Amino acid sequence: MSEPPVRDTTTATIAAKTAGMKHWDGFLPLDVDPKADRVLLEIPHDSARALLFVSLATGLGSNPIGLDRAADVGAYVARFDRSGNKVLLVLENWSYRSSSPNRDNARSVQESFPPSTVAALPIVGEDAGGRVLVDASDMVFRDWVHVSATLSDSKQGTYVLARDRSTVFAPYTKAFPKNTEIDASLTFALAGGAPGDIVSNILPDPTAITLRQHLSLMPLPDSGYEPRALDPRVGYFAVTFKDYGQPIQASLDQRWIGRHRLERVNPSDPKSPIRNPIVYYVDRGIPEPIRTAVKQGVSWWIKAFDDAGLTGAFRVEDLPDSVDPMDARYNVVMWENRNERGWSIGGSLGDPRTGEIIKGVARLDSHRERTDYNLYAGLMGAASSA
């Protein structure tokens, strides 16, 4: 029989280790250590789980490469497993599962497809009851977005993450009751050869590219949400997975549509108000008169929800000045500036287990409105009369 891992009983208490640091209480409390340029994260117990969202807070400004501001990169079910004097960050694999009540069948699936252990977080403090304080650097200063691979695939050069030129971005590193937000500036340095034409045209010095990467941690949603199968006649985003608990005559491939949760205060009353309406916040960086037009366009959804019997289920507002648009609690309509015209993209971050949308992200390219205006003006004869 193997012995359990040895734990260091001399580990400092959490209070002693974080004395004098900027503390944020919340879902996963955190402390920012400015001297060591690191984030210390409190894990409440062994095998604690959370939703983990990854986004780019700032962009490269190039449509062909695609590393854009507010790009939602990934949504994971994360688990923090203690192993000796460290905590392992494990990403659970929800692409393969079993709906069968047979627990052994579910176990066979779980043991057939691996999770991903992506970071080891040293324990630096510990309190009675299993609460530990970890140095989250291995999680924070990680190329979650695959910047290096994207630049290489785009033939822009071989870039590597330069830890000595990367730092915690403290203004947007905070914790709240329902979420913990961690922001970091990551610098990617040219490791050899010449930089590509695109980055050479955009960067003041193409041998170094600094982007901000944002991590959001939230509690797993409760079981009150009911997944809905994606109708193939509807072109929309979905959670796709293989369900090995399906009957022999059924397909393993399952698709659940991504959608927001809407619940009435009184579920038995079809006229009862909506408990938590969907609110989309419009980026204040959108210039007028475009911002007013965007708000008017988004507000068309109000009538659609009302006509569906969901009165008051949808609102649109300006993003408050004090709010970071990367904050996972806010659905946002973001303004993207690029060096050339590019795509406007609708996306979301949600629960990989069910398809429930937690944060909607609509990204508008700033060139498109100019292009549309020029097309309209040309058709109306404005170009010839100017």
Q: Model features per residue range: what roles?
A:
Residues 2-286, 304, 308, 313, ...:
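Auxiliary tRNA-acceptor-end handling modules of aminoacyl-tRNA synthetases
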Residues 287-291:
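Alpha-helix N-cap/helix-initiation motif
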Residues 292-299, 303:
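Solvent-exposed, polar/charged alpha-helical surfaces in well-ordered, non-transmembrane soluble domains
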